[in-house]
Amino acid sequence: MTYILKIKPARAENRHGNELEYYPSEQEELVEEALRKLACDRLNGVYLGPGAGVQFTMYELREEHRKRGHSMSHDELKRSLLICRSAGLYIERKGGEREVILDSSIFPTVMISSRRDWKADPKNARCYVQFNPLVTASIEVLTFRQFDYETLMSYSCQLSRWLHKRLYHNYVNAEILNTYHFLLKSVKRDSGLLNNERISQDMKYLEQTLEELNKKNIIYGFQKEIRRGKYNRIDDVLYKLMPSIEFTNEMKKANKRAADIHTKSPARLPAHRKL
């Protein structure tokens, strides 16, 4: 099954008051991850109407980013929230007749306290964000998985975070003798983060990412098999990842948690519910 994703840029003011177009970036990714973490803490997660969301203060959001080494100012956080509110996501299933799966922003609803309220009482000036409908759907049909958030937020490389989440979601049968395989071209296609002119540069960047995963004890090591095409040029590279003991233990815990949730959960909405 093939899907097409289109992203429409948001329009927001910069610090000089000029309105510009912004595509969601690494900063917006970090803001969304932090908000999902806050939703799991101290009963901040809420359901209002049909969607899951989170109530928080800008102080809490700033502190969460500061603790993870990604400090942002009040204005930077506000701009990221507004970009997530305005940037459009359009997903359709490609086939004989294209079927629209999703037409929404990253955050359909955003309520931000005023700067005056924030300055007067920063720890109690409440804000609210409604998550994307796909997040709500994942909660309703229990397709989410437990993963190591602290390690995720400690990476210096955006591709490291992408691969970290990919492994936690897909590598459910992680064992020391069961390696995880992927092709360089598949990472380039799926992540959108390998945009170098030469394949050798993509290899270098990806292998720097794998070294970072190794330092974080996610993988024990990796091997690569270079595949050559015409004129002996590199056509693709097959990577084989060897999981660390720490990662295999984490996956066993995540699998048990997922099994417990499915066993103990009440009746759920059907998996193919229209959004």
Q: What is each model feature region?
A:
Residues 1-275:
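Charged, alpha-helix-forming regions
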